[in-house]
Amino acid sequence: MARTTPIARYRNIGISAHIDAGKTTTTERILFYTGVNHKIGEVHDGAATMDWMEQEQERGITITSAATTAFWSGMAKQYEPHRINIIDTPGHVDFTIEVERSMRVLDGAVMVYCAVGGVQPQSETVWRQANKYKVPRIAFVNKMDRMGANFLKVVNQIKTRLGANPVPLQLAIGAEEHFTGVVDLVKMKAINWNDADQGVTFEYEDIPADMVELANEWHQNLIESAAEASEELMEKYLGGEELTEAEIKGALRQRVLNNEIILVTCGSAFKNKGVQAMLDAVIDYLPSPVDVPAINGILDDGKDTPAERHASDDEPFSALAFKIATDPFVGNLTFFRVYSGVVNSGDTVLNSVKAARERFGRIVQMHANKREEIKEVRAGDIAAAIGLKDVTTGDTLCDPDAPIILERMEFPEPVISIAVEPKTKADQEKMGLALGRLAKEDPSFRVWTDEESNQTIIAGMGELHLDIIVDRMKREFNVEANVGKPQVAYRETIRQKVTDVEGKHAKQSGGRGQYGHVVIDMYPLEPGSNPKGYEFINDIKGGVIPGEYIPAVDKGIQEQLKAGPLAGYPVVDMGIRLHFGSYHDVDSSELAFKLAASIAFKEGFKKAKPVLLEPIMKVEVETPEENTGDVIGDLSRRRGMLKGQESEVTGVKIHAEVPLSEMFGYATQLRSLTKGRASYTMEFLKYDEAPSNVAQAVIEARGK
């Protein structure tokens, strides 16, 4: 089968925003204008096409990044058909992992901001993730029809809060209930959409007289930004020559692809204005798969040789599984992005991470949660496979004759855990299956059994995250669970270097004995300097410990790291240097050295100023002005560090850093302090040393 859409006409984009910026409504309008969805689905009554899990419809927030394919030929049908694959990303901080994994497979992104609320805390998190993956992006300032809407204020916030270089591509004509359309700053014309057909048709008109001066000023700004793309254009511009429309667009495109500028559009998705021109901007300025660098990976050759795959059908097949979802009718759906080559349904591919073969039974392309079966997918495509047995988010699927492991995604460690048990004993096995399946879908969610209490423990990124897991167990798997009190994921570390710590395990009382003897140094590592939080240096000279026993020493210490001596929490940010020891020809064994290492570790840890670390959350509260004092007082009582506050149209925004252990039940407390008028967001920031009284209480509670 030949390719129907050339790869240069693909746009793989994410639509990303803060929780109430109107992202789902924006996506709905995209699906409407691209002709896929003939009745516009509204989030207001819970009927949006992209929000396809029941909870999303009830809560009105987007949880899962569904992938949808649409086609667009331009507002004035000025382009050949372009295929736009849209990945919808959640805006709530407990679902940061969903944003992270979608950023990894996108080529470009549309950042949606609310014209009233502007750049919100979650927008900053998403922005950092987009920076990490170097995703070119444009912005859409939505809700221009709302009270307090101010386009240029949001443009300024993109500059001051995100440190970006925003360049308006349009200006809003009017605002609030007087918002009627936009000025196109490239064409220098006003665009007026037709209300009678929900904005499908439009007219170019003259710019309103009272806006001509402002439009000229911002047009000049746009031209200067374009001229900065090359010396040639700069010379032409400085020489007083006019730049053509094609030159302006080409130059702006280049600068967006280089992540030098962010072009800003505006509108009101709800009022059917602006999304159409934003789609044109996606085609004009965001990259196709061939405009972004080739994907990096390593060959599966035992030497980890670096390799890359280009976005071409002629290269060997390679794809990244970026999401696993459970579908009530077909079981597991594995969403994947094809980076190179072609794959057909029925083909066998290699999961190079697990060294296992998988057969692509059926391949479907999703339109929200409706699906269309397809025979093949090619470089640049995003699709879902049915029937893959053992694929986890982040695995590489590739041609068995050309194995490659693509760059892995990094997933954060959970910061909160709770014990769960089924309400009826009969559901025990069903609960295990449900949790196993949910953990496969979501790598930031973990499940394990506590060895001491034999309880099932689930852990995640926040209270809302775990609420939704428990809710999904009930809805999708029919398992009702009782949940325990949330537990904080503390860590342990050391603050001081200790040298020459000895560990000896010797049992030699006749017959074959056991003998292992090690001497180590222990030292603190800079937090975050080592992704594993642990390093092991082998400094043995002259064979005082034979090489075959060194891994056993490392293993013995790593096993101790899982449950530290202070209170049984994992130990992080610590290094070990093994530099001396002794062995016995007959009695030494791997086990003996493992035990000797654990004795040395416990001994050294006590002397190395051990401390308890607690997770600190970045908390942002928006509250009416009259409640500011109460909110700040309450945060201080929770050991919060105030980091600043600013006045907003809607009240005051307070920035603080608060230990997670003090934030349980905060939503209820905030509601009663402000009569339900305040809102807050919270996300994990860092681990920090817990004060001695807090640490003592935790250690004592664990010791009971």
Swiss-Prot record:
NCBIfam families given in the database record: EF-G, PRK12740.1-5, small_GTP
Binding positions for GTP per the UniProt entry: 17-24, 88-92, 142-145
Gene expressing this chain: fusA
UniProt-recorded name of the protein: Elongation factor G
A GO BP annotation: ribosome disassembly
Source species of the chain: Escherichia coli (strain K12)
Cellular location(s): Cytoplasm
EC class: hydrolase
All residue ranges annotated as the tr-type G domain in the record: 8-290
A molecular function GO annotation: GTP binding
Predominant place of localization: cytoplasm
